[in-house]
Amino acid sequence: MTSRPPLGVQQRQPQQRKLSGPVLSQQRSLSQSQAQAQAQAQQQQQQQQQQQQQQQQQQQQQQQQQYDASSYLPPPPPVPTRNNNHNNFSNPNNTLNNAFPPELAQQDPTSIVSPADPSGSSPALSVGVGRYGTQRRGGSRLRLELSHNDPFDAFSSPTVIESPGLVEPHTQNGSLTHPMMPLADGPDLGDMSPHHRVSIPPQHLDADVPIPFPQRRPKAVPDHSRREQPPPPPNPARKDTRPKPYTIELPAAAPRYRIRGRSDGQGGQGRSSALATASSSSTTGSSATANYGCADFFPWSGTAGNHPEDQFNDTAIRVGYSEKQFVTPETQSAKTVLFHGLKQRSGLNALSIFFAGVLWHRRNAGQVTAPSTFKPPPRVTLTDTKKEVWLKDLANSAIPLRKLSRSIPHGVRNKVLLDQCLNKNVPIDRAVWLAKCVGTNELRTFRRLGKGNNASVLEGERKWLKDWTLVIENFIERVFFSFGEQNWKAKVNYAIQLAAHLYAEGLMDREHYLDWTVSSLESSHHSQLPMWIIIAQIYWKDLLRLRKYGRRLATALISHYHVIHAHEDRDIYVPLLSKLSHLLGTLMVATPENFVSPSVWVKYRDALKTCLPQGDEARHRSFAGINYRNEQLVASANRSQPAARIILVRNLDQVILEKPMPDEFPAQCWTVSKDKAALVRALLEWCTTPYRPGLAKVYVAHRILMHWSTLRLDVTSAVLGFMEGEALEEMECKDALYHLVSELVRSGIFLVSQYIQWLITRGGLTDPQLVMPDGPPFSRLLAELPSHILGSSQKRSRDALLRRAGFRIADDAQDADMAIRHLRHALGLPAGVTDAVSMGRPFPIKKIARRIEDASRARKAEIASWLRNTVFGGELEHSSLNAFGQHDLSTRLFNSIRTVFEAAQEFSVFADVLRMLTKCSNPEVLASIADTITRYTFVFAALSCLKNLFSILHSRLREVQEQGIGARPLLASLAYLASRVPGMDEVAMQLKSDLAVSDRHNPVDACSPVSDNMVSRLSDHDGDLHEEVEKLLANGTSLDRNTMDRLFSAVIQRLQAYWSKGDEQQRVYGILLKRLRMFNPQHFDELMTRWLLYVRGLDTRATILHLYPLLVSIGCLEMPAILATASESPNALGAGNSRHPQSAVATSQIVQTTFRTRYMQEVLQLFMAPVSSESLLTPEERYRFGILQEQAKKESPRELLCLIQLALAEYTCARAQNDLEELPLDKEANQDRLLRLLKLLVLKDPVGVAKALQIRGPDAQIDGWIDRMTTKLLVTAAGEGTRVTFEQVLNLTNEFTLPFCHVKLLLSLSSNDQQQNAADSGERVPSNVELFMNAMEKSMDAQRVSWIGMLPSLSPDLTHHLKNQAQARFLNLLPSARNPPSMTLDRSMLQMRLQKAENFLAIMDTIIRGSGPMGFRQHQLVPVMVERFTDILELLQTLTPFPSQAGGLGGWGGQGASAAAAGGDSHIDLKSDILNHWLPLFLNFLTLHAQTFDTSKPGNEVRGRALMVCAGLIRELDLIHGPDFDTRQLGGRIFDLACVLVDNLAEDARLQCIQALKSPSDVKLRYIFSYQDNPHANLMLCHKERPTAMAIGTATGTGSPAPGTTPTHTPGVTPGPQNAVGAGSAVSGAGGSGNGGSYFSLPGHTQQAQAQGWHAAQQQQQQQQQQQSQQQQQQQQQQQYQLQQQQQQGGTGPIPSPAISINTNLTHLNLGNNSNPPTPSPMNPTRPAMMMVANPWGGYSWVPTMGGPQERLTPFNFRQWEMLSEPTSQVGENDTAVNLMLFESRKVQ
């Protein structure tokens, strides 16, 4: 059988079969021994020439490429797993795979047909199997002998073995006959085998030797070197090897087409038909293939020349061959019809109309006219087996969906659907198809059940969609967190992809799904957080695009980062922290608006700052911008200078009262305000004010000025300007200034030369009063400057100026020398022989210290400098003490040095001395150094040496412990100091633990006064008690309560016995109590508290001022326990700052039992007065007790206030009982100490101080005493009878006196009730409240509002009244369109109005922010605020020169619009004032009320209205922005304010705002309102309505302009194809007429009608406005009908407002005549339909017609669930989900 091979396949040559006798005889003549010898020689030659063999293999490949395809050895198949008839082509031992070239080895084995087997079957058959499957012999003997020696050496050995009897049995891998060798008698292969030709050595290639046969097999000698072969497989089944007919293979890339008129697989013409017939009978057997032909493919069909393509002629050679379809030629030309019209002036319009008609005819050709036959696949009930088969078919991509769409198994829905898709691994697109099919049927079920009730249908559909979304969410959670299942990763990937596709196609409730994603991320555990981050990142853009989800997402990430970063196992979560840090950094740069949330930002700002990488300027810049935006929403409403001063003063007070000064504090203060000069002045005022006690403020100011000097601040000029403008009267203020300048001069940032020049320019110093101690600071400073730190020239200039003023320089130097000599003598330093001071008795160090305190700043600095030089110079080593640098350095010498420095107040020099003295090895001295640092922690922190000194002492502690010296005092002092040093909490805990261990093992210090003879001092009975305690300590670490109670009672009884004696044995029993406390500190403290309460109730006892300090110093009594006795309940122990002053009832009950013993007054004195030197305490213990006193004042202010209240009540009760003997508060010293204590407590809690001082009694002397005390707190120089009024209090109020004025004001207002009760019925006396209101009015008019800081603590009624008054006056000052401001106001008046508005705003800000959370709830947005906000927008729109485009908010106009516009350039100034001043002020005002969370309906309405105004302002500012007005920053503030407002807005109010804005298109508004646009929400259908008969009659006339004029058409309307067809606008299609106008003639139109057409256009415009209002009224009535009519084409969801229209024609589809093209019409339905009119002179015009069709738009509901790709099994013309008729679709020709 011969056939024409396919294209591209090489034709095989006929096989040559012959057997040569000489060859056989020659081959048989070879002996077996010769063959073996040749084989061995060949193997040796191969080993020696390996490189030559590689070249031979390359030659073999080149020769094999020339090998003919008809060879007996076809290439093996490349498929390694194919196994046909024992032939394993994947066997690596197959040498043919290695010998044949790659191009032949890679061919498909089925494409090579052997001549011996033309059926195309595989030629690899075994020896014993015949051609047709019958058993046959193995062939001739010669064939059995022809084989290779080894499979690995098939073509390399020339040896021929003649023994045919040693044939091994055939196996799969060990067969000697190659599997690809043909079974028939083969020809002589010597001429054809390239392998044999190459492998035969040259010595065997003789001329007379014929071509040899293939090599024979070697002898059956077992070869042990050959690797073992696997066992043979079982015998394969027989295969049909009969020949098969030749089939034409169609090219896969050839395009196919459908053969018309053929349904049975037959038909067609030419070779394509034959090819289709051949294809139908091919192996595929598909009936669908027979209906299609292959384009441009005409294979040889057996008969030569039966196709025109095979006939070569001149035409075919030149132009080629193509199948031309029969086309009927045109018999008539259009030239005669169009040529006349084209020659006219309107020829271009005519040509466009002609083309429009041609396009219309072309569009209607083949247009789809069949009705929609769409129907979703039905659901049927199937058995489980069939259902499983159907689902498996769905998972098989080879099975088309049309086959599966015949029926959907019932019951596959919701969870089952998703699980089956996951388990069957259904492709994603097919899984989505199944979900659509099921969802469509579910939704149609709702429509059938709820027919007639559209509301219930919509509600049911929404509920079903939400339930389906919940199923998807549960599915994702179940798959994601099933970590133990197999193929977990693949399942997770599948779930992610499926959910993402469902989300992308809108097959779920997107809002609910996004909310679930964010909520899950917020509440997830750390172990699940990475998975939720992955899910959130899939929908990253959609989440961040909306405020509703973006803010929550950012907050969740920050919260997780904060928690993990603070976790104790943070090292485990390092990868997660890195991921969160990267995400947060990306979010801050990409979407910073999501971090604008004041409440969240204040909480997580510091944590977020830690995740910023170093050097990333973009992220740091974004962080700073976000911080600034949040500060605008949480900081004070008024950032003017008074507010900045308050902030600075508040920050400065913290570093001297609450916590030590941090290193970054100066930089923080620098950023408080941009007015740096005002900042410096406020800092100097704070440093020199008498209302801030202590020395720490001087060093804090010095540290800050040093830092600011590096920022290019001229400190010298700032200080000189301050001294010139500030009048300092109090000596305390002057000393602080002199001290500060002295430190600045020592640091080198205050230039003395510039100061001297400044004095000279002012006239110098001529009056002696100028340099006296009470002289002005600017001149007295010259005498206070330390001379030892000045240069020689500066010193000479200073002395010259002072001499001119009469200052005695020599006397001053002599006094300094005398002070130093007395100090040398007191310290025991050697003096000169003739020194008279050293000959006398030395002064006590305390007396010298008092004189130093009274000396000038220059004298103090000189003495401190001399003492430092003495210590550093080693002069103390040669003193009589011989102590410095040795182990025996006495604490007395150190105490003397410390006393001098404390008197001189030179702590900067003292810090250097302490650093030097830390080299001492005496632990007592080191402990005293630690105590000194503890007492002045704030001072050394300001000097930035606190941590350094602590580190040195801590290292010295380890050295002392290693030396074995008693380190307990140093350990105790360091443990107490470590708790005060910032950042040393862990070290403090370790030191306290070491101290407890040390106390247990060494209960008595070696250096203690009772360490050696404590037991000997006790009596016998007391010694037994001590031994019992020692045994308990040695035996264990615990003690039962009964035993402790017994021992405690025994020790306390003995302690009370020696109480009044003042014996040293009090210390012994105190030590026993301390050792007893080690067993159970908690129970011991309870026993001690009970004993203190017992002591409080004793009628007769000794003073507690001697016993309590001793017990505290020993360690068995704590200061909080003593303060607990100031409460009625002893459980208040350790309550800390949570305690408040007692009520009047509780106070009276306590003092009734204590007024006789003065217990409360003594306890108060214990915390105020220093311990007497006559007590049993050592100097070191007294110093440490003073530290505890100072620490209690700072850490327990409220407990001290309770104590003060009880002491005053006790004092009042005693005076009421006429018990005036030895009242502690009657002493003047105690009153001064109480005044200083109150001065400190007022700065911490002014309200608590006022409540503590509200003690009223029958004795008027106490009231006067309290009033005088509060007056002295405010006015330090006030006399006995000084009275301060409310107006004076408000005038004295500033940033520094504010707490003291607050106390005075509260005390004055609290007496109002008693004043009213005591008033008689006579003339009415104004109350204190009325007086205060009048004083506030005067103060606000004078623009003095510094007192507003104390308003929040007033009574709620008073603050509410004041806030309302300030709010009303603030709103009246705002400009508006209804009440425009006068254009004639000058700038000074405008500035005054702005200042008043700022003052009123500051009052409201202070009241609202100071009232706490409850106050925020009371101060909410009210409608009047929104009205004024609207007025500002109206005025801004009125002043804008171009029309505003604030959608949804336009149309506003005020009564003052004309007045504002008539001012010329004045309205530009007003507009600038609004944008720069008034609008920012009002935004601050709204910010105060935006933090409230009001869930009520009126509150949501007000917030919604405010948001609408914000939206209008955002759009308005975008329009105003330009070179004249930069509104970007202001627009950003409004945007941030809107974000804060919308965060607390209810969901229904948000939807109403979106509806009012009519689908906002601005990106910022979409973000604010979280509006997610549905791309299918605004689709519209365009309907054409037929005109009435009267309308047709009105529009049937035509008119023409006068001859010679140019025809025109309606402006704004371009002629073109229209979708609306009028009744009389059909264009005739007849041709052949010679008149060009008759081709487009409109029958029935006359010239009169043309003239009336223009008039009709004007009437049409008037009627359109009426039709619009009617259509709006009818639209709501038609929605019900439209929803029912469009159920087959629509979807679910609410009907949106029309915004996008699908230009669709519905009327012409039902007219029955599609031959008439429609006339052009615009898309706007409000415009009139236009009609083309043909003029008699050849022109054309478009005129509006009343009879033309009117367009009406109705919403089109796009049903996403019905968008199925294969809805039915039968292909229809119009079976798509959306009706093709809506798009005027055409069929493909």
UniProtKB/Swiss-Prot annotation:
GO terms for biological process: positive regulation of transcription by RNA polymerase II. GO terms for molecular function: transcription coactivator activity. Residues 107-124 have a biased composition (Polar residues). The keyword Lipid metabolism does not apply. Keywords: Activator, Nucleus, Repressor, Transcription, Transcription regulation. Residues 25-66, 81-98, 271-288, 1592-1628, 1647-1656, 1707-1716 have a biased composition (Low complexity). It comes from the Eukaryota. Residues 1-138, 156-288, 1592-1656, 1707-1727 are annotated as: Disordered. One of its GO terms (cellular component) is mediator complex. Residues 220-229 have a biased composition (Basic and acidic residues). It is found in: Nucleus. Component of the srb8-11 complex, which itself associates with the Mediator complex. Belongs to the Mediator complex subunit 12 family. Component of the srb8-11 complex. The srb8-11 complex is a regulatory module of the Mediator complex which is itself involved in regulation of basal and activated RNA polymerase II-dependent transcription. The srb8-11 complex may be involved in the transcriptional repression of a subset of genes regulated by Mediator. It may inhibit the association of the Mediator complex with RNA polymerase II to form the holoenzyme complex. This is Mediator of RNA polymerase II transcription subunit 12. It comes from Neurospora crassa (strain ATCC 24698 / 74-OR23-1A / CBS 708.71 / DSM 1257 / FGSC 987). The lineage of its organism: Eukaryota, Fungi, Dikarya, Ascomycota, Pezizomycotina.
